[in-house]
Amino acid sequence: MKKNKSRSSSKKHFVGSEPGSRGKSVGLRIIGGKCRGTALEYSGDHRVRPMKDRVREAVFNLIGPDVRGRHVIDLFAGTGALAFEAISRGALSATVLEIHFPTAEITRKNIDLLERRMPGCRESIHLITTDVFFWGQKIREQDPGYPHVNPAVLPPEIPWLVFCSPPYDFYVSRKEELLLLLKTLRETAPANSLFVIEADNRFHFEDLQVAISPRKRKSYPPAEVGLFYTGTAAGES
């Protein structure tokens, strides 16, 4: 698997000092589906911010059975909990993006944990250690050297489920890059693809320039979550 490095960090996950400072191990688990109850590896590193269990559960309650049959793209994956929750609940496959090599190794261990509960699922999960913004640039350029990182090579009839849960500060410090990344994916995604955006109250969902139903906007302080679909009336309902 080709691994790409970039000077810019797209890590959710980095809110502090140099790599190496670690917190104690903290519990993280799959909440629903075939792998329900599976404990995931997570170091407790203060620079890694997985979506809280209660928020993840609420998000998947909003998505409901619509998770099934989709290809998941987890943009700022960290431990991979969002992608793995979706796989457990019936998603077909996943592209998992993580820039930090030590964190990606933990994610790889979590794939092994899922494999024990769902034999064969490892083959459907593609972990890429790369900068998310660099990856998005390659998709915009339709770079033929990166077909393995480009979800556009998937069968066009398979809709996506895109999770965007970056460091909240990115909505301020890298706002334009984030909006461009999401615009690129929105324009590339098959019809009826579903985007799940987690931010805090510094971000205005109107900046996405998509219609999000009030029923698909939820607040779980400090998290604000919005869901929208592409290419169908569902995104406007």
Give residue ranges: language-model regions.
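Class I S-adenosyl-L-methionine-dependent methyltransferase catalytic core
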Residues: 1-237
